[in-house]
Amino acid sequence: MKITDLRCALLGGHPVVRIVTDEGVDGFGQIESTKPYMVPHVLFFREALVGEDPTNVERVMLKIRQRGSFKPWGSAISAIEMALWDVAGKAAGVPVYKLLGGKVRDRVRIYNGGLRFPMTEYTPEEYAESTRKMMEAPQGFTIIKQPIGFHSPMKRVIPDFYYGQPSPVGLQGALDRGLLTERGLKHLVACVEAMKAVTGDGVGLALDCGPGFNPNDALKIARALEPYNLLWLEDMITGDYTPYVLADLYRDVTWNTTTAIHTGEQIYLRQNFKDLIEKRAVNIVGPDPADVGGIAELKWIAEYADLHGLMMAPHGVFDGLIGLAALVQVSAALPHNFIAFECPIGNPPWWYDVVKGLPDPIVQDGHITVWDRPGLGIEIDAQAAQQYLRDEDKTFFD
């Protein structure tokens, strides 16, 4: 089997990758929906892929992996890697998890990545109501993650939340940093107290916090929240769109609190997790398969983290339904340090008409049952997808 073409199109504005082979077996990957500019970055690798055997996934990846970097190049390579595994599984007639070593679990736990209920005032009462709605959702979440602090409009909405001037626009946490005020700390703790009054001890609560907090404030927050037994505090210092990790700063926080600290969604490749893991600078790592270099890369990181006593909770909120399929396959094969992955959704809802093969409902009792269809286990309905392609992408499925 040989690769004859590498294609990338915007499907409703979301980048989708297709690997075409000479035997009629296609593979698909998906890039985060927030990156519609990614098409040329993917197509840059076409020359390196054409003529290669896509079932030799690692051989192909060795040709392109070193050309990646922090977003966007790492995102392009990650989507290509997903598509390679999709082809390899289909060619072998087995689900991807079989090629990754087989199932460790029959169901994978998820948490509410793509499902959020809007808030306007970011008060304790609103957080409690939002959390209550998530607990009542049909997915039956056993873990709920809420945005707070610099990872939410709280920094703008709450007067004197921190000593700084919040930017009026921009990615959450990407632009704003500063020293937390006493008022800000008390407000943050009050919001957590309100949410925990709703969840009790039956549903785990995690917080997406930044980045933006300095290490001293991060430690102050973590210690203040120790009585609430949170699952984790995520991306307090770096994360999201910061192109570095700062493991030593995270270690200063992690080693001085019992509240679990989590980061890793922005990191590309295992080598860039090495410092974080070996220094045990956090308690939980959370690579995103759409950014880290793909699903096999994520599995390697999970295993290395497990050797060092760290847990794994992958990121995935913007990975779409193809990314969801990839997350299910790799999470089935992860070691026992796996907690749950952040579950992406189809948005807009027409994605569920385009991506075929997913269970209905997808999530039950906070879990997804691992399916056994070949490859990633999904297919793209080309006819249903046509209306959502740009004019220049109309030949994507030819």
Please place each PLM-identified region on the residue numbering.
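Structured beta-strand/loop patches that form or line metal/cofactor-binding pockets in enzymes
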Residues: 1-28, 348-355, 395
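Conserved, mostly hydrophobic/aromatic
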Residues: 3, 24, 80, 93, ...
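Metal- or metallocofactor-binding catalytic centers and their adjacent structured scaffolds
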Residues: 20-94
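Hydrophobic alpha-helical hairpins/lids featuring a short glycine-rich hinge
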Residues: 73-111, 115-127
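Extended hydrophobic packing segments that form well-structured cores
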Residues: 374-398
